[in-house]
């Protein structure tokens, strides 16, 4: 192997608490009451809205326009969430606060092993990259979490004009490293976006299954998916490929 690619959120780092908790934290000042029921409803509504959203791919190239499209994409998702659980006055002001809050490291945290594993892989002489459907705020998040300098490339959907699981975004990432698909691994927490997407582009796909999704239609073993529980298992797995 020459290059190891990673998904970002859910693979290298995670939201502190839950998205619903962050949404509710900022919504309280706008009169939204915090209860166990409202938190549960927000988390469920976010999962549904995010799942139903179109891919974050836009027919623009100007950096300012890309950021505008990203903001509108997220506005639709957050508006959809509160349309389901209860809208409130000054929603536009609220959205600006939440969108900005997720654009820095304050509400994100690295998984405990992330930095150590990335450094170990770099010490082996491997190149590292990110392939993510995150938006351009990712660059600031990576800097804030202290891992930006560990990556040789970062490929995101809004700049690549393609989103996982489409093979195009993987191929663009490969071109940046000038390697063949068989010389690269992609690690992520989604069977569809990450593992199947990587396979479509002929990379080695690895599922990081922190939640131990061992049952149901997406059972990793049933799909013969290379699976790890934490990033600590990745260096050994790579040695076998």
Residue ranges of each PLM-predicted region?
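Asp-based, Mg2+/Mn2+-dependent phosphohydrolase catalytic module
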Residues: 1-4, 14, 37-40, 88-93, ...
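N-terminal helical cap/lid subdomain that shapes the substrate entry/recognition surface
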Residues: 1-112, 124
């Amino acid at each position: 192997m020459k290059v190891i690619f990673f998904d970002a959120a859910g693979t290298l780092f995670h939201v502190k608490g839950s998205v619903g908790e962050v949404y509710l934290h900022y919504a309280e000042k706008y009169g939204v009451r915090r209860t166990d029921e409202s938190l549960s409803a927000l988390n469920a509504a976010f999962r549904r809205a995010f799942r139903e959203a179109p891919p974050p791919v836009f027919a623009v190239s100007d950096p300012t326009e890309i950021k505008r499209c990203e903001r509108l994409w997220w506005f639709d998702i957050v508006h959809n969430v509160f349309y389901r659980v209860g809208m409130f006055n000054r929603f536009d002001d609220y959205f600006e606060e939440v969108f900005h809050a997720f654009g820095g490291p304050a509400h994100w945290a690295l998984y405990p092993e992330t930095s150590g594993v990335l450094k170990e892989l770099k010490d082996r002489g491997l190149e590292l990259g990110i392939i993510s459907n995150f938006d351009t705020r990712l660059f600031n998040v990576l800097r804030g979490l202290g891992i930006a300098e560990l990556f040789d490339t970062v490929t995101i959907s809004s700049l690549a004009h393609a989103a996982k699981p489409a093979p195009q975004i993987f191929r663009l990432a490969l071109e940046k490293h000038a390697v063949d698909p068989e010389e690269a691994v992609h690690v992520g927490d989604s069977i569809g976006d990450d593992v199947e997407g990587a396979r479509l582009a002929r990379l080695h796909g690895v599922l990081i299954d922190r939640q131990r999704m061992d049952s149901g239609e997406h059972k990793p073993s049933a799909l013969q998916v290379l699976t790890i529980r934490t990033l600590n298992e990745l260096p050994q797995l790579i040695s076998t490929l």
